[in-house]
Amino acid sequence: MIYKNNGIVPEEIYNGNPIEGRHNHSELEYVMKGMLDGVLAGRKLTDKWDDALSRTLDAYLGEIPDEFSYNGNNYSPKSFFDELEINPDDYIEFTSYNNRNYYDWIELEIPDNWTNDKYFNVPIKDILEIMDNALSNGYSICWDGDSGKDHFYRNEGYAVIPVDDEEKLEDRTEPEKEKEITEDMRIEAFNSFDVTDDHLMHIVGTAENQNGTKFYYTKNSWGTKDKKYDGYWYMSESYVKLKTVAIMVHKDAVPKSILEKIK
């Protein structure tokens, strides 16, 4: 909806003013929060705060161009979006929580869903079926989930859900045995904030370890410096079962048997 209403701009035209070659939004976040906390403390809104916030964003990220030249052509953000011929309505967001009806649209109650989008709620086995079908047919997957807990090994480049939570990584001499993940485990982890929507990544393939355990090959956004697999991670199937909050795929990537259930 944001793209359809506002358009899109190439990164080389609007790069968000990266500082020292990379983005660092911490200062911007603190400035915005301080400003908005001050606005709220006044208890009565004036007509100035919106403009002040917009100017702050412009100072840190740059002004959004009304028109720009790209590859020898002139565009507005809206006309460039039209040129790309991307239809946002062709993409479907799926989630999986058993406290809500399956095969129905739900409003996923997470901070990142500030646009109040609807997600199609399916069993977790369907999430995996959608992912596998997408990858086997040349589609990638936008993954929304949790990467902030103990078993997302940042230096080693992989993520698992080991049976033995206490075993130290350095003590392991072979691949970990992993927990069998259930629907009840998923909703318990979500409701207890053990799983949050703290990160988004791009799943582009699969792999297996020496024991035949399936892993999803995942492009991260943390750069390549000091990363074992050049910015990619391997998430085990058990990790994906437990830690996935939602996925987004093109409608043509969804198995027909599941697509037919979408109302």
List each language-model region with its residue ranges.
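Active-site signature of cysteine proteases
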Residues: 53-263
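Papain-like cysteine protease catalytic cores
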Residues: 1-75
